[in-house]
Amino acid sequence: MKWGTPGMSSNRSFFNRGMFRQNLRQHGWISILYLLALIFVLPIQLVLAVNWDERFRRDPLDNLFVVQDTLQALILVVFPVITGVFITRYLQSKAAADLYHSLPLRRSHILANQLLCGGLIVLVPVWLTTGIMTLMTGNEQLSYLFESADVWYWGITASMVSLFLLVFTVFVGMCVGQSIFQTVVVYILLLLPAILVELMGLYLRKFIFGYPDSSLLGIAIEKLSPLVTVFTAYHLPLTWIDLLVYIGLCAVFVALSFLLYQRRHIEKAS
């Protein structure tokens, strides 16, 4: 397995072609499954719905997240996390960790290659699905249901959510040493803000007369958890401000991942 030219300076570029190809060979199947899942839950379901479901013939869609909303949300929150877990698995195996860190590459270069490969794995399926959906707007029956603007909004939102979940999973992977534990911690941390606010609201409603009930606080709670946000996107779409917040969070967690990676003791790999 040839990952670089012997003697190559590690300062030349963050991109290493050999490592990138190896990552795609190892983890490219995730991208293929992600693409097939998105095609099944959106283009195929829309074609079937137009032909068999009278509701879709009467009213245009509010947004594309209403199509198989629960299944679609599940796909969007599972595949990026799986990708993040797999591209950081080398840190949790002593042999793989030793192999990666014996390469003539700095840790920052290794992590940059992993993030780049992971980003392509989760983004390419979303972009291809967006392209398919854009072509479908040329169909007379389907163009009544949704427009190009709806497709691009879905594509941007799905891309941002996928990228954030990937980056956050990599960040957690820098802190823990087991893949299963990493996955559990990711979902717990993503739900934790909404759970804490809900518990605080229950406590305050019990002791403060006139404190607003959960129905008044529901929107704020839904915005606090990326997982809840995805599952409620069919009736509460993300705003452009929300997307900018996710971009900012991605930048923060990428920076923290690089910082933690530089300080991580590889000998702790199990």
What are the roles of these predicted feature ranges?
Residues V67-A96:
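Long, hydrophobic alpha-helical segments
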Residues Q26-D53, L71-I82, V186-L196:
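Hydrophobic alpha-helical transmembrane segments of multi-pass membrane transport/permease proteins
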Residues I87-L120, A269:
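Helix-loop-helix units of permease transmembrane domains in multi-pass membrane transporters
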Residues D62-V66, C117-G177, V186, A194-E198, ...:
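Secretory targeting signals
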Residues L76-I82, S159-T169, V245-F258:
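Hydrophobic cores of alpha-helical transmembrane segments in multi-pass inner/ER membrane proteins
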Residues K2-P6, S10-R12, L48-V66, I195-A269:
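Terminal transmembrane helical anchor/hairpin motif
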Residues K2-L35:
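Aromatic- and glycine-rich beta-strand/loop motifs that create alpha-glucan
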Residues R25-W29, L33, F86, S108-T129, ...:
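Alpha-helical transmembrane segments of multi-pass membrane proteins
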